[in-house]
UniProtKB/Swiss-Prot annotation:
Compartmental location: Cell membrane
Similarity-based family: Belongs to the amino acid-polyamine-organocation (APC) superfamily. YAT (TC 2.A.3.10) family.
Highest taxon of the lineage: Eukaryota
Disordered as annotated region, ranges: 1-38
Gene Ontology molecular function: amino acid binding; amino acid transmembrane transporter activity; basic amino acid transmembrane transporter activity; L-histidine transmembrane transporter activity; L-lysine transmembrane transporter activity
GO cellular component: membrane; plasma membrane
Protein name: Lysine/arginine permease CAN1
Keywords: Amino-acid transport, Cell membrane, Glycoprotein, Membrane, Transmembrane, Transmembrane helix, Transport
Summary of the function given for this chain in its UniProt record: High-affinity permease for basic amino acids arginine, lysine and histidine.
Induction remarks: Expression is induced during phagocytosis by host macrophages. Expression is also induced during biofilm development.
Amino acid sequence: MPEDYEKYRMGSSNESHQKSVQPISSSISKSNKKTKHQTDFVQDSDIIEASSINDEFGEVKRDLKARHVSMIAIGGTIGTGLFISTGSLLHTTGPVMSLISFLFVTTICFSVTQSLGEMATYIPISGSFAQFVTRWVSKSCGAANGWLYWFSWAVTFGLELSVVGQVIQFWTDAVPLAAWISIFFVILTIFNFFPVKFYGEVEFWIASIKIIAVFGWIIYAFIMVCGAGKTGPVGFRYWRNGYAWGDGILVNNNGKYVAAFVSGLINSIFTFQGTELVAVTAGEASPRALRSAIRKVMFRILVFYVLCMLFMGLLVPYNDPKLTQDGGFTRNSPFLIAMENSGTKVLPHIFNAVIVTTIISAGNSNIYSGSRILYGLAQAGVAPKFFLRTNKGGVPFFAVAFTAAFGALGYLACSSQGNKAFTWLLNITATAGLISWGFISVSHIRFMKTLQRRGISRDTLPFKAFFMPFSAYYGMVVCFIVVLIQGFTVFWDFNASDFFTAYISVILFVVLWVGFHFFFYGFGKDSFKMSNILVPLDECDIDSGVRDINDAEFDIPPPKNAWDKFWAIVA
């Protein structure tokens, strides 16, 4: 740990701005220099002492280990997006554009996770980045962003439930779809009331199955490309003779591939959504777990996403009729289609079981993530206080119950418009997630400016993000541009349904932001004071929640055996 950071934590530098650095449970109540925004950080309608909140409601526990944190990030990401919605992406954009889309979103993910890592390791609190926007941008913006991000995960839980039964119907449709949804709805909800260490342990082993399966599929795909399947050597067969770029999505040839690329970004972003989950665990994870997991994000993305997309494009032609056939989402999965096209009989059934496990794991992570975001919003004073209440295991049970209730959206799959409902939910969650990514970058820019104002070098932080501040500005600009243009194709043949599908999350965010602004500051002329619209740098709170962490807590012990070395690399 850099010496300057140690001095800063112990209160020996920057005296003009310094407060004693203590856990959030005490730093707010004991600070003598609270600004309006800082005191609002844990209040509802009146100023509430953080220590009294913990006494009354309890608090989450830091029971997650490094392997748990890494697997939660993987478990929440590798799910419906990768295994199922990539089929729609491949069909719409072709193999090359799909790969380019994945690589482009990879750059956004890298920027966002780097920004998040620098902030979350410095101030490790539950639902961290929802609170960061509240502290460093504005309370109303933070409330809107946090609620929208929570909404995206609550809706994603419903989306996962809508798919799991259809995946099981790959084998049999004797059991009604609603029955499968109900079974997993109840099981996953109940499980999230157990202490977080049990959640972390189960998620570790389920996510381990995912990792082994994805690695196995990549090896299998490589062998098939080289000629082991019934079709002989495939190579780049489906990248030649016009197959590489697909058909585009416009009737004329003007810009049809650009339009396809932009339209396909939503599928790509939905697939990648969840890479930021490592920061959601900040309040329940050890410091070394956070830093280690964030450093490996890029490796996981390149292996689990980019390589998979590459081989899917090599083995499955974009115009394969199976990508759009009726009969359930699993039958549209490029993973299974690649196996079937290669003549493998048993593997599709084995991999379908993996997909079922994957969706269950993702749904589990959806509830966990949403509940911790809601807990963080309550800490920040922008959600009702009762969401802070925890059980003896440190689980915010009201937050869990409220988040899980949105699993009822899964029953939309039982209607005749089930596929349309899936697309609608996918667009809502992807766009909402992208808005949150953009504000993570905005928060990091404000965080860096506040550090600079206080004379604190980023070299002294527990984790220093790469390519800053350029990377943060890149993430902010690209995220907001994509949010605005991702649905532009609806204007070619405009109808209200498609418009709201594309932009409902944007509309919801604006309504929440304006509504919270007037709720917090009223309708008077002071409502539009610049300090209410954007927190002044001198008032940005970078003290509350900073933990007194010693060097040993950041040291990662060396692997003891080959098994430890393997997990040290992949997780």
